[in-house]
Swiss-Prot record:
Protein known as: Lysine--tRNA ligase
Listed NCBIfam families: lysS_bact, PRK00484.1
Residue ranges of the TM segments: none
Cofactor binding description: Binds 3 Mg(2+) ions per subunit.
Lineage: Bacteria, Pseudomonadati, Spirochaetota, Spirochaetia, Leptospirales
Taxonomic source organism: Leptospira interrogans serogroup Icterohaemorrhagiae serovar Lai (strain 56601)
Subcellular location: Cytoplasm
Keywords of this entry: Aminoacyl-tRNA synthetase, ATP-binding, Cytoplasm, Ligase, Magnesium, Metal-binding, Nucleotide-binding, Protein biosynthesis
Length: 495
């Protein structure tokens, strides 16, 4: 039997021993009235005596048994506090239970605070109760100096067993607490800007709103094929048609694509649409939102991301899609007239464009390989080609291009926005072109959506639209370098 299995068996045996004593190892309830950090801070300012009792609940973090007295540490979601327990105070039965506790056990305590000779605020335990046994041993390095867990450093294992990761790595928990604050702050910001939060279908008969492969499912009762949404865009714009002038949705999207440090098949997006807005109003909104978040969450507009100090102070730099590709690859795609020439130039840069069917698809691969990794400081890339933007309004001053921008920070895209196409005739033509690309083998090309065309035929006002990837934004504001570090339960291969 392995050492781990032996420890598990020993802990299970302790549960059985408690049952024999008539003690329920999984009691129905325990209600703490305090948090360790709060009572320690208050005690430091205003010491209390034995008459003031506190009830705490948490995990046993460390333990040192010294005969009739023991020291330990309890960890709750506010911090760690030292415990002092004696046989005289607890009595034979409870002190025996205290001594038999294992690291990771969830316990309930009652006691009063005092300071040790070394000046450490400590809970003098007067009552102890096992609330849930930690049957599987937590990763342990040592049981002294307040350091009892290893780093749980195997990344794959951390993602698979996030519950253990959260127990042993405080910085992981801090990341997800920050994520929650970011999401809450986004909602508050947009609400103050006059946007109404809405919910649109997660299952859609047509996968639209983005160039991506969808997940496919089937509704048995209706006997119809459905897709998990790749984007909420077309439904949100239907709401603009219906007179809801400012709407946003912050929710999940699903794309049946690869997994990387920047991509997870299930991810969170915020999309916002503003009637009587355009690309410029959404650019302003994006800049204000992200700088607001940085100031609120990080306390500064200059944030450290890896080795780079990123300055989010407005105004952000702006440059065109064609110019940024030319800057980092030397290729001016506005001057290329054949697919063969485009592929040849890309291949000279060792960019794989074998699956690309158009010049601008080649350009996009070159952009991703050569330009994007260099966009460390915040920048808005503008004036995208019409072919790559089937839902964006054409730029009247630049034929072949649209009113679209994407913000980039730390070498990755964090959003996408444009002046929305509201001409139903133009939109139908673009859908038809996308269908041709799809029939030619591009499984990321858009599907035809006749109902969306019908909605546009009722009239949609000039509109600005914006989408921001929440997971990537959290990466930026928490100095995380994999999207999996910002998603509690990322998709994993089977063990």
């Amino acid at each position: 039997m392995s050492e781990s299995n032996e420890l598990i068996e020993q802990r299970i045996q302790k549960i059985e021993e408690l049952k024999k004593q008539g003690i329920n190892p999984y009691p129905v309830r325990f209600f703490p009235d305090s948090k360790s950090k709060d009572i320690a801070e208050k005690f430091e300012k205003n010491p209390t005596g034995p008459e003031t009792k506190f009830k705490l609940g948490g995990r046993l973090h460390s333990k040192r048994v010294m005969g009739k007295a023991s020291f330990a540490h309890l960890k709750d979601n506010s911090g760690i506090i030292q415990l002092y327990a004696t046989k005289d105070d607890l009595g034979e039965t409870q002190y025996s239970i205290f001594k038999s506790l294992d690291l990771g056990d969830i316990i309930g305590l009652e006691g009063y605070l005092f300071k040790t000779q070394k000046g450490e605020i400590t809970l003098h335990v007067t009552s102890v109760e096992l609330l849930a046994k930690c049957i599987r041993p937590l990763p342990v390095v040592k049981e002294k100096d307040g350091v009892v867990y290893d780093a749980f450093a195997d990344v794959e294992q951390r993602y698979r067993m996030r519950y253990v990761d959260l127990i042993v790595n405080d910085h992981v928990r801090d990341t997800f607490i920050t994520r929650s604050k970011i999401v809450s702050e986004i909602r508050s910001f947009l609400t103050q800007e006059g946007f109404l939060e809405v919910e649109t279908p997660m299952m859609q008969p047509i996968a639209g709103g983005a160039a991506a492969r969808p997940f496919v499912t089937h509704h048995n009762t209706l006997d119809m094929q459905l897709f998990l949404r790749i984007a909420p865009e077309l439904y949100l714009k239907r709401l603009i048609v219906g007179g809801m002038d400012r709407v946003f949705e912050l929710n999940r999207n699903f794309r049946n694509e690869g997994i990387s440090t920047k991509h997870n098949p299930e991810f969170t997006m915020m999309e916002a649409y503003m009637a009587f807005g355009d690309m410029s109003t959404m650019l302003d909104l994006t800049e204000r939102l992200i700088t607001h978040l940085a100031q609120k969450i990080c306390g500064t507009l200059k944030i450290q991301y890896g080795k780079d100090l990123i300055d989010l102070s407005p105004p952000w730099k702006r440059t065109t899609y064609v110019d940024i590709i030319k800057e980092y690859s030397g290729i001016d795609f506005s001057q290329i007239i054949s697919l063969e020439e485009a592929k040849k130039k890309a291949s000279e840069l060792k960019v794989d464009v074998s699956k690309c069917q158009t010049i601008w698809k080649v350009a996009d691969e070159v952009f991703s390989e050569k330009a994007e990794p260099n966009l460390i400081q915040p920048i808005f890339i503008t004036d995208y080609p019409k072919e790559l933007s089937p839902l964006a309004k054409s730029n009247p001053d630049k034929p072949g291009y649209v009113e679209r921008f994407e913000p980039y920070v730390a070498g990755r895209e964090i959003g996408n926005a444009f002046t929305e196409l509201n001409d139903p005739f133009d939109q139908k033509e673009r859908f038809e072109d996308q269908v041709k690309q799809r029939e030619a083998g591009d499984d990321e090309a858009f599907m035809m959506d006749e109902d969306y065309i019908r909605a546009l035929e009722y009239g949609m006002p000039p509109t600005g639209g914006l989408g921001i990837g929440i997971d990537r934004l959290v990466m930026l504001l928490t100095n995380s370098h994999s999207i999996r570090d910002t998603i509690l339960f990322p998709l994993m291969r089977p063990e």
